[in-house]
């Protein structure tokens, strides 16, 4: 049964944040929040190594990013990123536990220590870093907010949506962007707010609204999940910038640096031509930039608290950025989303990583 639309209490997150801040300032630390013993002064990296498992927060089910397959195994772009981090840190891509989180749960779960890393198609914003005590470890996917509309509405662009009933998930930048877009274009709409993406989708499918709005990448998967996909269309408009990326707590700079550089390593691997299929051959390379990548020169693994071959580990199982993208979102997936902005900067996109130097 589809949950009824609800009103959102915008002050709850502020109250939760205040409680978390008090606990931090009181010196109680993460041991209180996490629910298991953490040695005094231990950072996230030490905790992950001692536990032997990376705790990764993902979505409750977004096609191409994080969802369970028919065997119950987690698959997707964000899932593969978590596995790359686990492989770099623990030497085993399988040593990761996935925790599905709704949009309203995700940041509290991260702040409270329930997860070590959030890879849950989350948009990097000023407020989330400055107000919530979080840090985004780069951008893994350049997205934008779009609209999935019933063909019966006869809308061909977002400007055709005046007076439409629109389903949206609570606790997201999507709500804010929606209000800004309609106000800027002197249009009105009826907002139907739901506590999870799944409930917003169910409401759209059952006819409680004419339009579903969220990140455009997710809408392609939503359309395919409909009983009659041909009766809905993803409109071409993108009304916002949605830089999606992994998130960590802002009070652990070494862990932030590590996660950020695993992200960069996947991009650098694509630039260097290092992939899951040829990484063993790369170990024989005499090119200086490749030798730094494989850990033969530079000593960067030690600086991160990792083994010298940390970047090789990250790529060996799941592949470089291109392999991860194409398998989950691009030509090798059911979604078939063109890379667009997510192409390398040298190929017409904006994907760029600092050098391993």
Named regions from a protein language model:
Residues 8-11, 16-28:
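Bacterial N-terminal signal peptides that target proteins for export
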Residues 25-37:
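Bacterial N-terminal signal peptides
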Residues 49-119, 304-306, 317-321, 344, ...:
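Extracytoplasmic small-molecule ligand-binding "clamshell" domains
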Residues 55-64, 74-89, 123, 143-195, ...:
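Bilobed "Venus flytrap"/periplasmic-binding protein-like clamshell domains
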Residues 80-83, 87-89, 151-155, 159, ...:
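Extended ligand-binding regions for polar small-molecule ligands
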Residues 83, 87, 91, 95-160, ...:
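Acidic, polar ligand-binding/catalytic clefts
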Residues 96-108, 191-206:
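Short helix-initiation/N-cap motifs at beta->coil->alpha
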Residues 300-357:
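C-terminal functional modules
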